[in-house]
Amino acid sequence: MFSTLIFLTAVTLLMMPSQTVPAPLKDVNDIRVKGLLPLLRQRQLQIMPSQTIPALKDVNDIRVKGLLSLLRQRKQEIMPSQTIPALKDVNDIRVKGLLSLLRQRKQEECDDPDGLMCCTISEMPTC
């Protein structure tokens, strides 16, 4: 019975994604963020079933505008011990939180009476 408990604990730990960020990231080549984008692409069916995940060019990209302030408001939920400076690159670990916020933000903006923001994520640069 004890070995079963250890096995179940190990399986649970393997299935739980890590939520901690031990220290502020200095740059996008930090070992903790290398390879994040390919992982996001592998998981895109779980994250956004009908969307592709195009590269975010910079913080001024239409898909990111307004999200940093939303992320700052929710930083206690996402990374309680971290400050959130400007997003530098799509490989930044902060994109993990931005993807879920992007879906939420897109839904909020689709209530816009002008309808200008009611695009799919992949259409945004051209809509």
Curated annotation (Swiss-Prot):
Domain of life of the organism encoding this protein: Eukaryota
One Gene Ontology molecular-function label: toxin activity
Which Gene Ontology terms of cellular component type are present?
extracellular region
Q: In which tissues is it expressed?
A: Expressed by the venom duct.
For the modification Pyrrolidone carboxylic acid, the affected residues are 44, 76, 107
Q: Which residues form a coiled coil?
A: none
Q: What is its main location?
A: secreted
| UniProt keywords, alphabetically | Cleavage on pair of basic residues, Disulfide bond, Ion channel impairing toxin, Neurotoxin, Pyrrolidone carboxylic acid, Repeat, Secreted, Signal, Toxin
Question: Where found, per UniProt?
Answer: Secreted
The PTM entry states: The turripeptide OL172 conotoxin-like contains 2 disulfide bonds.
Signal peptide (UniProt feature, chain positions): 1-20
- Pro-peptide residues, renumbered to this chain, are 42-43, 73-75, 104-106
Query: Its biological function?
Result: Acts as a neurotoxin by inhibiting an ion channel.
Q: What is known of its domains?
A: The cysteine framework of the turripeptide OL172 conotoxin-like is C-CC-C.
Q: Spell out the protein name for this chain.
A: Turripeptide OL172
